[in-house]
Swiss-Prot record:
Originating organism: Vibrio vulnificus (strain YJ016)
Coiled coil: none
Gene Ontology molecular function: 2 iron, 2 sulfur cluster binding; electron transfer activity; metal ion binding; oxidoreductase activity, acting on NAD(P)H, quinone or similar compound as acceptor
Name by which UniProt lists this protein: Na(+)-translocating NADH-quinone reductase subunit F
The record's free-text note on cofactor binding: Binds 1 [2Fe-2S] cluster.
CDD domains: fer2, NADH_quinone_reductase
Reactions the enzyme catalyzes: a ubiquinone + n Na(+)(in) + NADH + H(+) = a ubiquinol + n Na(+)(out) + NAD(+)
Amino acid sequence: MDIILGVVMFTLIVLALVLVILFAKSKLVPTGDITISINGDADKSIVTSPGGKLLSALAGAGVFVSSACGGGGSCGQCRVKVKSGGGDILPTELDHITKGEAREGERLACQVAVKTDMDIELPEEIFGVKKWECTVISNDNKATFIKELKLQIPDGESVPFRAGGYIQIEAPAHHVKYADFDVPEEYRGDWDKFNLFRYESIVKEDIIRAYSMANYPEEFGIIMLNVRIATPPPNNPDVAPGQMSSYIWSLKEGDKCTISGPFGEFFAKDTDAEMVFIGGGAGMAPMRSHIFDQLKRLKSKRKMSYWYGARSKREMFYVEDFDGLAAENDNFVWHCALSDPLPEDNWDGYTGFIHNVLYENYLRDHDAPEDCEYYMCGPPMMNAAVIGMLKNLGVEDENILLDDFGG
């Protein structure tokens, strides 16, 4: 009898605990549909299930907020204003949002949990963002570690972007072997030297990254990107290679690729001020877009120059394009500086780092460098060096425009 009584008591205790858990769940875990009101416009409101993050809920309803890191909380781009229902701001958001901005409701959509009805504000241009499945036209090396990915937009479609804008590219889970990359013989020296073909990239979930466009708006029907492969650094070869760059480098003619956009804020100012463009590495992309747009579409007569830094002649690309623009436009000149020219380059042009070359050969003797507008995109060290040099010349922040996606 004691055994039976013990079993009964144990069963009753378990049932009681289950009831407590179910009751707590009903109070703590949201059920039913969640309504997200957007910009006070009933037509823009979306209804979704609770759980997940605001960024995903918006994307599921066809509202694509920029997120270069794919929702990891590291890029700080997916900023929205949450007027109610977002809960407390998280420590991960405070790396990108000031306390003052937080008081105004600024949040990162990728960090906001969807638990209850919400009221948010989004920029109106977000509603012009679309998604396309594109076809790879070509994916060719332009330098040792840079490919030009050219995508065909579906027939009848267009991407209404501005020069300096960017798109987001999606990659499914994948397993990429560097040994399968198509790298022309002229670029294989460093690949063999650093044994780069041994690497593989294994990604077990969908990812999203942002890339600036190299084409300009009147190159219709295509999207063109300059993508630098993110290989592990030589001093830490066991680090995993870049996920998205590895995927992009694996793409072949005819492959399908999903993009969304357009996004952007790295746009040219509508003034008559002199424009100075500074680029390096894959930072070529928005520079090409801007310069082509100014000279070919806008027929701009603004004085402009382009200063590009590369290691050697092998790393220079679009040379004929810029030579042609310089020949056709008296208001445009361009210069390339090589930091490590090879003997076979027979280089008689500028040498050294591009910020020093720009200063020594142009800005040092410029009548008013502080009055120019500076547009730059390149590796972080280049960007920092250029900004430091410009600050020393008295250039205000408003005249220094930086695209962080290049390089």
